[in-house]
């Protein structure tokens, strides 16, 4: 689907725009521009490529650069003419698109740090940026000349680069999905799990909160939650798995919803990417295949999102939860089996069983116990001819079980109530 360009480092589509930018900005720029300069003696005096704006109050903004090389810094010399020579310059967070697609995603978070900061007053300024994937990068530069009343004047340029040593994001995704197809049985669950595990091996969380795209995740090996979500979404889409972004605007976090075997599930690759092993189970899959209810235990703001009308990826099943599928949920449930059966044998019709993980934080214990409660309700209990349902208590660290008759309506009522409960210590 993605055509590889034969020409290396081809430069195309130079777009020049002026006026107030309507493009939202992200933050991480000039840490890469730490070596930028405003000293004319340190600048290159001749450049191969350039783009400039139309005049505004007599001021013209110009950007110049030489042949870019993937994996190396490209210097962008930004200057202005016709004004006071007391200019303030800014570089926006670059955006990236696969070749021939022209569907751009900000490489970095445009709302933070140097991306939103103008330089001190100067005649010109050098910005630097390293391109890391074959494709098209969009660069935007701004100037202010307050003396002449020029604000937010912009020049924008697209630069297409190609190098087989630096594949496009699309090529990286397609190669991963091709390998996934060879190493799994082709089911939605197996593909989603394989791609989840593959992605976690590719990158680390960017604690500087700068890199926030699939490009940064797959080529810079760093990213925020937005990078994890974006990269995983591209992988799932390429594998034929329906997915959507779940954005917790209350907590400032994002993750994926995916549709496996016709049902929606929540998965948080960012929180699964951990080296911790504090809780005696595989934490790298704790947030794979959760219900909305359980995910809200980790991300409290999600409780207000998934309960709102119009929410489109409602997730209520644990059938394709990682621990349910690999058998750990059943093992955990069996740890409570003797205690539950002992109460049943004693003729109790309603009782509580303390959990073994009460010391864990709610985002850990609550999710684990929700999965255990699901497994408990898949088990068969000896209680004469009566049914037994088990749930987790919303406020205390225990499971509770209740015996009831054969009424299907009553059974559904109880199970629905308990599955809707949250678990908190």
Spans of features found by a protein language model:
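Secondary-structure boundary elements
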Residues: 166-217
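Exposed beta-strand face motif in extracellular beta-rich ectodomains
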Residues: 133-139
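Short glycine/proline-centered coil/turn motifs in the loop regions
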Residues: 81-85, 96
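Hydrophobic/aromatic-rich core segments of domains that either
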Residues: 227-293
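Short, compositionally biased P/S/T/A/G/V-rich stretches that sit at domain boundaries
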Residues: 31-68, 313
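Sec-dependent signal peptide cleavage junction
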Residues: 19-37
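His-Asp-centered catalytic microenvironments across diverse enzyme cores
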Residues: 263-266, 270-366, 370
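Conserved structural position at the C-terminal beta-strand
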Residues: 143-145
């Amino acid at each position: 689907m993605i055509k590889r360009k034969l020409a290396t480092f081809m430069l195309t589509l130079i777009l020049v725009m002026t006026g107030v930018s309507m493009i939202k900005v992200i933050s991480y720029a000039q840490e890469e521009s730490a070596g930028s300069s405003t000293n004319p003696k340190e600048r290159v005096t001749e450049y191969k490529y350039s783009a400039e704006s139309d005049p505004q109050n007599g001021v013209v903004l110009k950007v110049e650069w030489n042949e870019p090389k993937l994996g190396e810094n490209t210097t962008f010399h930004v200057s202005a003419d016709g004004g006071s020579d007391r200019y303030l310059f800014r570089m926006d967070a670059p955006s990236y698109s696969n070749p021939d697609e022209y569907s751009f995603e900000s490489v970095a978070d445009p709302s933070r740090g140097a991306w939103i900061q103008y330089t001190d007053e100067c005649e010109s300024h050098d910005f630097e940026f390293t391109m890391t994937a074959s494709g098209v990068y969009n660069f935007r530069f701004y100037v202010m000349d307050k003396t002449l009343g020029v604000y937010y004047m912009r020049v924008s340029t697209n630069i297409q680069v190609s190098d087989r040593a630096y594949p496009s994001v699309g090529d990286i995704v397609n190669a991963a999905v091709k390998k996934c197809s060879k190493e799994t049985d082709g089911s939605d669950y197996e593909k989603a799990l394989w791609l989840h595990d593959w992605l976690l091996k590719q990158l680390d969380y960017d604690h500087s909160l700068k890199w926030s795209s699939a490009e940064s995740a797959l080529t810079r090996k760093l990213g925020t939650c937005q990078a994890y979500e974006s990269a995983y979404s591209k992988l799932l889409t390429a594998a034929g798995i329906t997915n959507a972004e779940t954005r917790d605007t209350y907590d400032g976090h994002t993750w994926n919803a995916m549709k496996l075997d016709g049902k929606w599930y929540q998965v948080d690759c960012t929180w699964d990417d951990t080296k911790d092993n504090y809780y005696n189970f595989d934490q790298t899959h704790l947030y794979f295949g959760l219900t909305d209810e359980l995910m809200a235990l980790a991300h409290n703001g999600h409780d207000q999102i998934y309960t709102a009308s119009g929410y489109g990826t409602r997730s209520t099943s644990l059938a394709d939860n990682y621990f349910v599928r690999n058998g750990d949920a059943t093992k955990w449930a069996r740890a409570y089996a003797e205690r539950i059966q002992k109460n049943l044998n004693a003729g109790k019709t309603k009782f509580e069983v303390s959990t073994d993980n009460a010391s864990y934080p709610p985002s850990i214990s609550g999710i684990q116990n929700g999965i255990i409660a699901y497994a408990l309700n898949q088990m068969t209990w000896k209680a004469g001819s009566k049914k037994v349902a088990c749930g987790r208590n919303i406020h205390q660290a225990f499971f509770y079980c209740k015996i009831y008759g054969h009424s299907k309506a009553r059974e559904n009522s109880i199970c629905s109530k308990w599955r809707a409960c949250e678990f908190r210590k």
